[in-house]
Amino acid sequence: MKLIIQIPCLNEEKTLPLVVKDIPKKIDGIDKVEILVVDDGSTDRTSEVAEELGVDHIVQLSYNRGLAYAFMVGLDTALKFGANIIVNTDGDNQYNGCDIPKLIKPILENKAEIVVG
């Protein structure tokens, strides 16, 4: 079971390291956790920071297309890379990465196909 955590970003070079650091590297029931950053036309070093952090996948949009577009690109890309489960989190460190195992638990237990939280 592969989990890809997608992070749509716009000028998040300062907060992205906090977000990536907070994401659990191992989760019970998940064989592989990967991180995907979708850089929505940032004018700062968001993509470079993502690369320095060693995230698994980076998609750079040539200009700001908006959060909804970046989100959809992230979903399509995560599926292309074989994600069984996709979690979206924000690049501004708004959500706690430690909540990801609780978020996906109903999916792993076959109690839900989608979870929003």
Segments (PLM) and residue ranges:
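Structured catalytic core of nucleotide-sugar glycosyltransferases
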Residues: 1-117
